[in-house]
UniProtKB/Swiss-Prot annotation:
Species whose genome carries this gene: Roseobacter denitrificans (strain ATCC 33942 / OCh 114)
Protein name: Arginine--tRNA ligase
Source taxon at top rank: Bacteria
GO molecular function, one term: ATP binding
One Pfam family linked to the record: DALR_1
Catalytic activity as recorded in UniProt: tRNA(Arg) + L-arginine + ATP = L-arginyl-tRNA(Arg) + AMP + diphosphate
SMART domains listed in its UniProt record: Arg_tRNA_synt_N, DALR_1
Amino acid sequence: MNLFAEMRALVLECVDQMVTAGQLPADLNMTNVTVEPPRDAAHGDMATNAAMVLAKPAGKKPRDIAEALAQLLAADARIASAEVAGPGFLNLRIAPTAWRAVLLSVLDKGTDFGRADIGAGQKVNVEYVSANPTGPLHVGHTRGAVFGDALASLLDYAGFDVTREYYINDGGAQVDVLARSVYLRYLEAHGQEVAFPDGTYPGDYLIPVGQQLKDLKGDSYVGQPEEAWLQDIRTFATDAMMDLIRADLKSLGVEMDVFYSEKSLYGTGRIEAAIEDLKSKGLIYDGVLEPPKGKKPEDWEPREQTLFKSTEHGDDVDRPVMKSDGSWTYFAPDIAYHYDKVSRGYDALIDVFGADHGGYVKRMKAAVSALSDGKVPLDIKLTQLVKLFKNGEPFKMSKRAGTFVTLRDVVDQVGPDVARFVMLTRKNDAMLDFDFDKVMEQSRENPVFYVQYAHARVASVMRKAEAAGIAVDMDTLKAADLSLLNHEAELGLIAKLSEWPRLVETAARSNEPHRVAFYLYELSGVFHGLWNRGNDVPELRFVQDDPKVTQAKIALARACSVVIAAGLGILGVTPAQEMR
């Protein structure tokens, strides 16, 4: 039950009545008519801009339309009052019976309350993490993993058919560097002293990989030239790193549907097919790009290259796809990979990149636009840096990696639930401070604790009621006399619950799962406020002498915990039954 959607439908119904009565012209565009929470809660429960939107096309004063609308709206049993404000805004107060219907809907649907169908089964591919398979995931990958996973869950909750995908960057030179680094650990496992040249990977995480290689191959690679072992160790090391990465992701509660290998694009004709598709559309040509101003990108050459006319699809400059020596640029396999995604029949694509890939956005969007003839939108979400603090100081070192803090470092210290929630307490493109001490504090300033405490409080009050012999099973709560909930603080909590379905749709349309975390914090604040008022106003306490009153109040508390559980489920966080 989406009360905001119901009220918007009611507003449009009243507009139709005005059209029928000759008060408004027919064929008005209703697209921009909204019903939403007012900026100032003192003005009402909801507000509509209908009169302001329709005034100009109708050739009438907005206030005149608003006053006529107010009369029609006030006749509906769900509306307690409809008041015109300013030049033509319309503020609505919802009748208590309508609020109680929302509460009953929450109890009836459980965590499906708020589940939407705006996706209508459209296929969406969400690609995230996609870290180079050269070592354990670091804290930056952690943020991308959590954001992408929560976004995928949000879209699933909103009715989309979602595929979670990881692109394995196993086709580039960095995997050769990994193989050489593993070879050094392999020699070390044979008792040799080795030095790690600049540019190799010296982290301790490769020590067991070197030992595993020794166990598998014995001394067959010792003293051999690079060409004798590079390709074998390349494959062995990549597989070992992907096992490590999969384990890292699992520790965070992230599981992918698809792992797609970049290497599979080479020697299979897939890159050639993608470039040929662009060529058939007149978007590939040979030419020399103007020297770029400032820092020169690695794919620029002062010679003729094969170029993609990305400027015809919104990019700033055309992009090289083949170098003058006939080898592919790093952009070419990315084009081929997205060509494959388009070919798999997705209705929309989402890529989650680190902020350092900001310069890649326009060219990638141009490629997908060209490959899909503008039919498949690509949204690229950038996740900003995470700054870690411990004991008030920046925290930068890792025993595992030697140079950076790993995902496992974070999960081991605070657990997956805290790590996931905190990563969503800021919009993805805003810097995030992660303080290991503060995220474990039991205070309002710690949003993880604040939300989990609300859920745990409901569980505790239900246990208390059961101990007093009061039935609080779901069937009993659904049958409770909800008319006993009439205090403005109780109705205010229901009003906040009513925002959940609208919030889900808004967050899903904008691909912004952080909105769920923000809402849960606000909802928990309203719940804690009601709980704390019970200290001064005894009739607001959830457990009363009268079992029927207790059941009604616990029905409200239970509905709150249901919505919190639904939101935490989207974020990939397990709701707490008690605080420890």
